[in-house]
Amino acid sequence: MTLNSLPVWPALQAHYEEIRDAHLRDWFAPANDRAPTRAERFTFEGGGLAADFSKNRLTDATLALLVRLAREAGVEARRDAMFAGETVNPTEGRAALHTALRANAPDAPFQAQVAAERAKMARFADAVRSGAWTGYTGKRIRHVVNIGIGGSDLGPKMVVHALHHVATPDIATHFVSNVDGADLARVLERIDPEATLAIIVSKTFTTLETMTNARSLRDWFVANGCPEGALAKHFVGVSANPAEVVKFGIAEANVFEMWDWVGGRYSLWSAVGLSIMIAIGPERFDELLAGARDMDEHFRTAPLERNLPVLQGLVGIWYRNFFGAQSYLVAPYSEALHYLPSYLQQLEMESNGKSARIDGAFVDYPTSAVTWGEPGTNGQHAFFQMLHQGPTLVPIDFIAVLTPEHPLASHHPKLLANCFAQSEALMLGRTLDEARKIVGPAKPELAPHLTFPGNRPTTTLLVDALTPRTLGALIALYEHKVLVQAAVWNINPFDQWGVELGKILGKVVEADLTAAQVDPAKHDSSTSALIARARKALGE
């Protein structure tokens, strides 16, 4: 199946040509905005969230055609296959059952394993939080260091930061991912070896960055007085390869299992989220799972026409495959969601940044857009200039939390006002005539610089309050959006072969950086020159 061979495709193309030059401000004009208003017609709810799609460049007819596209592309079948535990990752011969981690239903796949591992996590988290689990000198654990990269870092870091307001104040959580030693060194400056617990997270337990940092941290513990035999009080491992964890030196009792039917970027709901559970406690971790489960149920049961993940995915395809948008922006107006854009970068681009269809043929249409973002209002003082007046179309997801999670409540109306005003300004713009009235006859040459084209599409997601439950729903919303788009593009969102070639060549280059001699013909001339310069700087 190719996207442009679907029966609905010509109708979508014709519809795009029909409305491509229409302006959103005209669709919001009083004559066109009768009851029910455009906002009422294009605002939908699910999983405890609300999404206002009304400031997007689409009509009722657009949505109807896009929903037809979803049906013809088999979105429902792909969704149902994923929930049923079928092999939806054919290149690796695996299921993708991150939803089973929060299913809480006896007939869901792997529920006995999931429940047993979560109970083990809860016992351990309670022991650390209560002080029953101590360091080798008997000190309470005051620092948790999570060492992982990609899905073993981005998800837990994002959630722990987002839920800081409900986390224990007695334990500081640190995250180390980069193989650049500066990342670990900065954490080592802030922690106490007698009161620190390290969580090493790697599906294979062979990941270069993770194991390099883990070995350096182990050496630091020993150098700072921890006997080799007492390291078990300070190290636990999370992996799908328990034998390799034990080989590293972590006690078998301190190994938490993840499974190959959960992809790394979908794994925060598993033992990969142990740092989350220690920070917020098992009960709140269960609430996080419950929120994701709310969105799972909405995704499974809501009609496509009112299904938030489906609509989000289809709107993204509308801009990517018809308007030619090359990127989209995530702008959470919540400092608590500071790391959400980084998390979504991996979730979206590692999942759907593919050129090969499931059947092995190459696509002849764009797939994943570049995902980027920054919390509001910071972004307004950095790149919003380009969004308002630049020639490039960048669709935006605004995320607004309606009640603050902090005591400085007087700040919150200002924050929300900025979020809503930006979406309005991006939609309305300012015409040249309006600009001329502002500058008056004194400086007519300034008027073009004060014009805004408007017609810039935005979706606003509303969260009543940032709780573990609403955060779980928000994360699951984006997970399922990715699946919807993958189904339409007919690609596999659950593998990531694109990261492999660089890893293979990286090992070769690393060996050449320290080898006694290097054959200059081994690499292209650019890479050889880079290696030569680095060898000189390293003293080789």
Swiss-Prot record:
Q: Which HAMAP family match?
A: G6P_isomerase
GO BP terms: gluconeogenesis; glucose 6-phosphate metabolic process; glycolytic process
Record protein name field:
Glucose-6-phosphate isomerase
Q: Name one GO molecular function term.
A: carbohydrate derivative binding
The record's EC number reads: 5.3.1.9
Localization recorded for this chain is: Cytoplasm
Q: Name one Pfam family in it.
A: PGI
Q: Which UniProt keywords apply?
A: Cytoplasm, Gluconeogenesis, Glycolysis, Isomerase
Q: Where is the active site?
A: 350 (proton donor), 381, 503
